[in-house]
Design a protein with these regions (language model features):
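Short aromatic/hydrophobic "clamp" motif used to bind/position activated sugar donors
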Residues: 126
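Non-catalytic membrane-proximal stalk/linker segments that position and tether the catalytic domains
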Residues: 1-41
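Cell-envelope/extracellular polymer assembly enzymes that use nucleotide-activated donors
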Residues: 42-47, 73, 209
Length: 215
């Protein structure tokens, strides 16, 4: 992160494995922001689909709630979980008014869950965050600022690194690299939803298809 000019990552004094304790202090960034975070920040909707993700959901939400870009709508879409995911999401929503919970009632799959969040999203920009991911506090800001500053730009993505609970890096494929384009983090202008439609209701890789649909 440091070579990219980002805040350094630290291990927080929290229980659990190292991955669940990742953090970075966005305080220096927030102290330069106005008292009303929506005053100069467009609303970004973050769709967070979850299915039986009670063990990981808290880490994902903690990362989103700590974003330097504070004007967020966090849409947790529970896809018919049989564990405590829905209860945990509702508890988080009681603590943070930016969190909204949508309950599917039964398991429909990852992309129907994303589509439910897509339909409900009210932000000027919309993105997705997987339930088992952690995001650096500057992630949302670094994706949305180019969209605001360059009106002709339609979408942005981030990059990801796969690690285990002990933060040991692991390769996703048999390739000589560690960092990959994160098409599931696609952030787009809300207007594209009307022009391009929703994710295909398939089991895998609909996010990649949507990425190329924009191209």
């Amino acid at each position: 992160y440091l070579p990219q000019g980002l805040l350094p990552v630290e291990i927080l004094d929290l229980p659990g494995p190292l991955f669940d304790r990742l953090g970075a202090d966005p305080g220096p960034l927030r102290r330069t922001a106005p008292a009303d975070p929506s005053a100069d920040q467009s609303l970004v909707s973050v769709i967070l689909p979850v299915f039986n993700g009670a063990e990981v959901l808290g880490t994902a939400l903690r990362g989103l709630r700590a974003q330097s870009w504070q004007n967020l709508e966090i849409l947790v879409v529970d896809d018919g979980s049989s564990d405590d995911s829905l209860a945990l999401a509702r508890a988080a929503a009681r603590q943070d008014a930016r969190i909204r919970v949508l309950a599917q009632g039964r398991n429909l799959g990852a992309y129907p869950a994303r589509n439910a969040g897509f339909s409900a999203a009210q932000g000027a920009f919309i993105t997705v965050h997987d339930a088992d991911d952690w995001s650096h506090p500057q992630k949302i800001e670094l994706q949305v600022r180019p969209l605001i500053e360059e009106p002709e730009l339609q979408a942005t993505v981030s990059h990801w690194l796969r690690v285990g609970n002990d933060l040991q890096m692991a390769r996703w494929r048999m390739e000589e690299r560690w960092v990959y384009r994160n098409v599931s983090s696609l952030m787009l202008r809300a207007g594209l939803r009307d022009g391009l439609g929703y994710w295909d209701r398939v089991r895998v890789n609909a996010d990649t298809e949507y990425y190329y649909r924009i191209l």
